[in-house]
């Protein structure tokens, strides 16, 4: 996973061997689109991404050879990754949302969630509320991300937008939470993925204020 700042080891001083055993590259946002295009060119691994609050340039120059998973569930070798980019809204502009707006985005995905029977990995730019987030509005997390984890119990949640100010990993109930700042290698055993499939969330969407009837 990559986010927030371009890694000199992967760009300025690129050594192809550093990516030889990487199956998938996941960007959590706020990265130069040329950086993503570069990685897509020099590795066989697919590069998927969500946008950060500083990624307005993607509208005019999206990263070549990469896959945007915004508001979608991308499946890779049976692993389902749900993408929700953007930060908490703190000014006018793209890729920023209020809590209510983010909930509406999730609500629009209810049929995809039902069809895919949930998801395994949550990919976002912003953190979840009171989980590696900040006190200021730009770095505040979304409650709806916690709601998604409570309902679907994903194996992994990867996010960005708060730099190195928190530790790399923590746990939220059964979900492994990773801060993707700069770059971080995540290894998931096939056995762990298979075990998680056996614990997939409900086939029906959430009810209440997240998925109103």
Predicted regions and their residues:
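N-terminal active-site segment of His-dependent metallophosphoesterases
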Residues: 1-42, 110, 114-118, 212-213
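Binuclear metal-dependent phosphoesterase catalytic core
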Residues: 2, 11, 73-77, 147-152, ...
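Active-site neighborhood of phospho(di)ester-bond hydrolases with catalytic His/Asp-centered motifs
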Residues: 2-3, 24-30, 48-53, 69, ...
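Conserved catalytic scaffold of divalent metal-dependent phosphoesterases
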Residues: 2-10, 51-140, 206
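Active-site environment of divalent metal-dependent phosphoester hydrolases
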Residues: 6-11, 31-37, 53-59, 89-93, ...
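A generic local structural motif
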Residues: 10-16, 34-37, 67-69, 106-111, ...
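Short, structured coil segments at secondary-structure junctions
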Residues: 42-43, 63-64, 173-175
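A short, gly/pro- and small-residue-rich
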Residues: 43-54, 142-145
């Amino acid at each position: 996973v990559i986010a927030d700042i371009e890694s000199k080891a992967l760009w300025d001083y690129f050594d192809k061997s550093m990516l030889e055993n990487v199956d998938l590259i996941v960007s959590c946002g706020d990265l130069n689109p040329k950086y993503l295009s570069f990685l897509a060119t020099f590795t066989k691994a697919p590069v998927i991404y969500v946008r950060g609050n500083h990624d307005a340039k993607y509208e005019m120059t999206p990263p070549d050879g990469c896959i945007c998973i915004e508001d979608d569930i991308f499946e890779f070798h049976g692993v389902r990754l749900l993408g929700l980019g953007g930060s908490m809204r703190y000014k006018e502009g793209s890729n920023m949302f209020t809590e209510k707006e983010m909930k509406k985005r999730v609500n629009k995905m209810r049929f995809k969630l039902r069809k895919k029977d949930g998801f395994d990995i949550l990919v976002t730019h912003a953190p979840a509320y009171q989980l590696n987030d900040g006190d200021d509005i730009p770095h505040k997390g979304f409650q709806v991300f916690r709601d998604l984890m409570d309902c679907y119990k994903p194996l992994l949640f990867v996010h960005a937008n708060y730099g190195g100010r928190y530790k790399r990993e923590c746990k939220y109930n059964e979900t492994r939470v990773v801060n993707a700042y700069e770059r971080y290698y995540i290894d998931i055993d096939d056995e762990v993925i298979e075990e998680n499939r056996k614990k997939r969330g409900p086939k029906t969407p959430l009810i209440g204020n997240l998925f109103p009837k």
